Amino acid sequence: EFKNMIKFGDIIKHKNKKSLKLVNKNSEFENLAFVVDGEASITIENNVEVAKLKKGDWISEFSFITGDKTSANVISNDIFAISWSKATLQKLKIKKPELFEKLNSLIARNLCEKLIRSNKK
């Protein structure tokens, strides 16, 4: 079913020494993204990296779920991702509720995986 989600998203491809800022800290939720390949860094003040996102991870999922502002920056020099705008996700919730629920399940599973990874550090 995730394949059905792809057609509603936009492609992000970036490979450059200059980092692409995917998320700005303390911003309103704008986009949810899925890392297809590459990686991204989650950073806080003074560009201190607190975590890495890799293939299969979601970007901005906390803000998507809670509606809160973003809690960190996300930057990347090498990433291939699929991104869905807030408006697209709202339409999906109304028009394809079963697909929207699957999306929430995928995100919940990934959050658990991230928690397990962070506990192993």
Name what the model sees in each region.
Residues A33, F64, F100, L115-N119:
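Alpha-helix boundary/capping detector
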